[in-house]
């Protein structure tokens, strides 16, 4: 995060610039645009390298169509011999086309026909690219400065308001012109035009051992207005992955969650902004389609106001429509109706602006490594609202790093939200040699906002009058509540692991709309296991190994009499015993009459009750008759 280093900052307090212009807030409205420029020299090393570059752009097209179809994307081929017009030739009416450049796709929103057109082009690119576009003669080098001018003109005349425009130049040539030529100096002068227009220029090398020294190191530093020594050679493979995912290193604007003021003390504050570490993978919006033509049903919320007649009837005297913001709430107070408009309601809800207040500092060891509440956010300064915020922020960050301290703050992240206790943990940008995952580039020097699950970290601070100390809990209650917090479960949504359900949904959408199948890897792209092992090693000492539990011997269960199973064996009943009435009564009491034979049951009925039953009577009927006579 070198952008808020005081050594690289412009002295805003010197009065060299208009203070009103500096303090004016940046306009965050607009669209993102990315213009792909593919060097035709890629075909000289074999058509496989050109296909690899086009496949990267194909992945970016598909991801843009599925995730955010409002971004503008264009495609230009540079250093070509021929300049065939694009499919929409009228889009270049107001643009001056230089030689050795061909516009395949002007800056447009991604739609299904555009992606289908690109896929059809890729189907025959192996045999048709050399004939349709060719390579610039005699040495395959066109005018680099004219190509940059074409890109700037296309971005300016795209017809949309842009807030983040990028030019991605895909090549394997280390310099567009010889260093002793006039075209080389003219190309370097175009870097100042990019810096003035605030357009980002990125080189995407198609070879891993790409050399930036001859030309692109100086060109990129001039376009970004940084020192030549501050340039760091990026990883070529990492840049190709970034391009396919369309998450470039400088894209902090899309991930910004809000801007707020950080109050350090009386009459001392600075403006900051906070972000998510990673974007959530948004599912496509649910829509309703018509059965006849699969067109999307578009609905619009409308509020209709009806006024009835005063005579008490249900007849409507007047009816009109209002906007959603023009509605109101009505409550009956006494005999009068009190009307509260939405504007008045929002003013009551928005009494407090998002802000953060510093409470104190604690040692870093007092913060547990794992917090069972919610994912952390990332914070760094914003010099647009309060001048000098970057300098003050860096001073606080450096002091916390040196003293190994964390800042305990009260944070209200957005309007109408509940203030939360948070800890600001200073973090440093990882070295390129330590982590080769390109997602680490999204995080730099700054503070990590860790949400605290309980208030134990602010227990021994001076809370003054605004927080009553009588509400504090003793240590036993805090430990008990910590155990409760650890039992809570939250949805684990790591964006570094592919969501199999989302991949399946996207594959089905692509198969339905573009009629081609995709390889869904599912959970194959897991995190680096070595990084996981390092984190697990820190947690292993907290676990205890118990002795193996002895499994008790299983007892043989008795057989059940249900489901046709045989019951326990009983002694045979002698006929002499049946002559005794007391013995028969005991059999009936123990419900053991079923153990007698049918002949014995007939003998009991005839001998003791003088009842004769038919010989064909079933055993159950005989038992029921004996039980009835006993009653």
Swiss-Prot record:
Domain Ku: 262-487
Location in or out of the cell: Nucleus; Chromosome
Effect of residue 136 to V: In strain: NC304, NC322, NC359, NC361 and NC399
Highest taxon of source: Eukaryota
Keyword terms: ATP-binding, Chromosome, DNA damage, DNA recombination, DNA repair, DNA-binding, Helicase, Hydrolase, Nucleotide-binding, Nucleus
A Gene Ontology biological process term: telomere maintenance
Keyword DNA-binding: yes
Keyword match Hydrolase: yes
One function term, GO molecular function aspect: telomeric DNA binding
Enzyme Commission (EC) number: 3.6.4.12
Region (Disordered): 550-570
A Pfam family reported for this protein in Swiss-Prot or TrEMBL: Ku_C
Chemical reaction(s) catalysed: ATP + H2O = ADP + phosphate + H(+)
Reported effect, residue 553 to P: In strain: Canton-S and SB2040
Main location: nucleus
Effect ascribed to mutating residue 48 to D: In strain: NC304, NC322, NC359, NC361, NC375 and NC399
Subunit composition and interactions: Heterodimer of a 70 kDa and a 80 kDa subunit.
Function text: Single-stranded DNA-dependent ATP-dependent helicase. Involved in non-homologous end joining (NHEJ) DNA double strand break repair. Sequence-specific DNA-binding protein that has a high affinity for a 31 bp sequence in the Yp1 gene. Site-specific DNA binding to 31 bp P element inverted repeats.
Matching PANTHER family: KU AUTOANTIGEN DNA HELICASE, X-RAY REPAIR CROSS-COMPLEMENTING PROTEIN 6
Family as reported in the entry's similarity comment: Belongs to the ku70 family.
NCBIfam families, alphabetized: ku70
Protein name, UniProt field: ATP-dependent DNA helicase 2 subunit 1
Source organism of this protein record: Drosophila melanogaster (Fruit fly)
Gene responsible for this protein: Irbp
């Amino acid at each position: 995060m070198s952008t808020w280093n005081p050594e690289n900052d412009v002295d805003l307090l010197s009065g060299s610039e208009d203070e009103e212009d500096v303090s004016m807030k940046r306009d965050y409205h607009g669209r993102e645009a990315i213009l792909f420029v593919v060097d035709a020299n890629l075909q000289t090393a074999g058509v496989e390298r050109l296909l690899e570059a086009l496949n990267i752009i194909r992945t970016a097209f598909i991801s843009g169509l599925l995730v955010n179809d409002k971004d503008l994307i264009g495609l230009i081929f540079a250093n070509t011999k021929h300049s065939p017009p694009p499919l929409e030739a009228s889009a270049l009416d107001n643009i001056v086309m230089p030689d050795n450049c061909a516009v395949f796709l002007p800056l447009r929103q991604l739609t299904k026909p555009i992606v289908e057109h690109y896929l059809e082009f890729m189907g025959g690119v192996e045999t048709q690219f050399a004939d349709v576009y060719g390579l610039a003669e005699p040495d395959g080098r066109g005018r680099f400065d004219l190509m940059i001018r074409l890109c700037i003109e296309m971005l300016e005349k795209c017809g949309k308001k842009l807030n983040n425009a990028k030019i991605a130049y895909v090549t394997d040539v280390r310099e567009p012109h010889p260093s002793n030529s006039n075209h080389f100096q003219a190309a370097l002068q175009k870097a100042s035009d990019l810096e003035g227009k605030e357009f980002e220029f990125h080189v995407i090398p198609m070879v891993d051992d790409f050399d930036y020294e001859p030309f692109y190191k100086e060109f990129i530093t001039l376009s970004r207005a940084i020192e030549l020594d501050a340039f760091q050679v990026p990883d070529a493979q990492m840049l190709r992955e970034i391009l396919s995912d369309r998450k470039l290193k400088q894209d902090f604007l899309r991930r910004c969650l809000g801007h707020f003021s950080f109050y350090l003390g009386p009459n001392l504050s600075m403006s900051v902004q906070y972000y998510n570490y990673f974007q959530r993978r948004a599912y496509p919006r649910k829509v309703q389609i018509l059965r006849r033509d699969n067109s999307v049903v578009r609905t619009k919320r409308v509020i209709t106001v009806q006024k009835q007649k005063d005579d008490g009837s249900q007849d409507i005297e007047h009816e009109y429509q209002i906007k959603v913001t023009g509605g109101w709430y009505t409550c009956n107070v006494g005999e009068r109706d009190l009307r509260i408009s939405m504007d008045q309601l929002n003013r009551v809800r928005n009494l407090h602006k998002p802000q953060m207040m510093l409470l104190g500092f604690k040692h870093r060891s007092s913060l547990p490594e794992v917090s069972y509440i919610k994912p952390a956010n990332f914070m760094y300064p914003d010099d647009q609202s309060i001048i000098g915020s970057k300098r003050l922020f860096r001073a606080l960050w450096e002091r916390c790093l040196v003293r190994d301290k964390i800042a305990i703050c009260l944070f209200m992240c957005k309007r109408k939200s509940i203030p939360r206790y948070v800890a600001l943990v200073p973090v440093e940008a990882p070295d390129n040699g330590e982590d080769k995952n390109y997602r680490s580039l999204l995080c730099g020097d700054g503070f990590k906002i860790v949400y605290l699950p309980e208030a134990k970290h602010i227990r021994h601070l001076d809370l003054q009058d605004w927080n009553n100390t009588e509400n504090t809990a003793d240590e036993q209650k805090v430990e008990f509540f910590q155990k409760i917090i650890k039992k809570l479960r939250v949805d684990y949504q790591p964006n570094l692991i592919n969501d199999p359900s989302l991949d399946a949904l996207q594959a089905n959408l692509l198969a339905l709309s573009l009629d081609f199948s995709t390889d869904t890897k599912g959970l194959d792209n897991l995190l680096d296991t070595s990084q996981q092992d390092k984190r697990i090693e820190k947690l292993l000492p907290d676990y205890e190994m118990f002795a193996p539990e002895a499994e008790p011997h299983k007892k043989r269960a008795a057989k059940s009499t249900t489901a046709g199973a045989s019951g326990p064996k009983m002694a045979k009943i002698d006929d002499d015993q049946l002559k005794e009435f007391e013995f028969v009564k005991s059999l009936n009491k123990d419900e053991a009459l079923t153990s007698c034979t049918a002949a014995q049951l007939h003998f009991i009925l005839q001998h003791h009750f003088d009842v004769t039953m038919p010989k064909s009577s079933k055993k159950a009927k005989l038992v029921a008759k004996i039980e009835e006579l006993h009653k």
